[in-house]
Amino acid sequence: MSRELIRTVDAWNKVKIARDPNRPNTKFYINEIFDEFIELHGDRNFGDDKAIIGGIALLNNLSFTVVGICKGENTKENIKRNFGMPHPEGYRKALRLMKQAEKFKRPVICFVDTPGAFCGIGAEERGQGQAIAQNLVELIGLKVPLISIVIGEGGSGGALALAVADKVFMLEHSIYSVLSPEGFASILWKDSSRAEEAASVMKITAQDLKRFNIIDKIIKEPRGGAHKNPIKMAQNIKKTILEALGEMKGTDLDTLLNERYNKYRNIENNL
């Protein structure tokens, strides 16, 4: 990605940056931000979806449950992780781990980076829509602090299933939308080649979503994008997580849950 392109930072350029194959993924951030991480597997029903990483982590002697949608770092790993498109068993694994966090009173940190939930026949047969809907229902009432960070693409319900949280953050050049610009252009204008125009109309950038109060904060990226200095980006995310937890530390559970509920109930008033 050229320096000139980064400087332009219009919506379509941000789409390109968010999709950059060299952009740090969830696995990288987990390894860089947390002192220790033990990965847990499976949804206890069908199998283990490699598109979602989850487990228990330590940071500054505090325990967390960390769950994230992960793209691959190369073609082989992308195939293994289904290019960051989770199956229903992935969302059920995520929910299993978050309910476990509730039981043991661990805060939950979610990383979101997906073009969307996988829409194959098998995924539909195993209840993709139900799995996503169940996550939305459960997360709105989960009795622990929840932080969600969009680190690249935040595509549709597949992203939202890990993004109902007390604090929702986006990296500076990430995107978050109901569907891809290509999909939007194809459906509304019957012309996928108008994706660049669609990206601007859709208001999918972190700056747009902060203005509408859909998200709580934009995390600044290093000059040139997160992939130019991944370590610095991880440090920025770590600092933001710790600051957010500090803000929520003195909040009693009832207040936390009421504020989370009202946050989503009142979104329409900001549009």
Swiss-Prot record:
One of its GO terms (cellular component) is acetyl-CoA carboxylase complex. It catalyses: N(6)-carboxybiotinyl-L-lysyl-[protein] + acetyl-CoA = N(6)-biotinyl-L-lysyl-[protein] + malonyl-CoA. Residues 1-247 form the CoA carboxyltransferase C-terminal domain. Keywords: ATP-binding, Cytoplasm, Fatty acid biosynthesis, Fatty acid metabolism, Lipid biosynthesis, Lipid metabolism, Nucleotide-binding, Transferase. Its EC number is 2.1.3.15. SUPFAM superfamilies: ClpP/crotonase. GO terms for molecular function: acetyl-CoA carboxylase activity; ATP binding; carboxyl- or carbamoyltransferase activity. The keyword Transmembrane does not apply. Gene3D superfamilies: 2-enoyl-CoA Hydratase, Chain A, domain 1 (3.90.226.10). One of its GO terms (biological process) is fatty acid biosynthetic process. Pathway: Lipid metabolism; malonyl-CoA biosynthesis; malonyl-CoA from acetyl-CoA: step 1/1. It is found in: Cytoplasm. The keyword Amino-acid biosynthesis does not apply. Component of the acetyl coenzyme A carboxylase (ACC) complex. First, biotin carboxylase catalyzes the carboxylation of biotin on its carrier protein (BCCP) and then the CO(2) group is transferred by the carboxyltransferase to acetyl-CoA to form malonyl-CoA. Belongs to the AccA family. Acetyl-CoA carboxylase is a heterohexamer composed of biotin carboxyl carrier protein (AccB), biotin carboxylase (AccC) and two subunits each of ACCase subunit alpha (AccA) and ACCase subunit beta (AccD). This is Acetyl-coenzyme A carboxylase carboxyl transferase subunit alpha. It comes from Clostridium perfringens (strain SM101 / Type A). The lineage of its organism: Bacteria, Bacillati, Bacillota, Clostridia, Eubacteriales. The gene is accA.
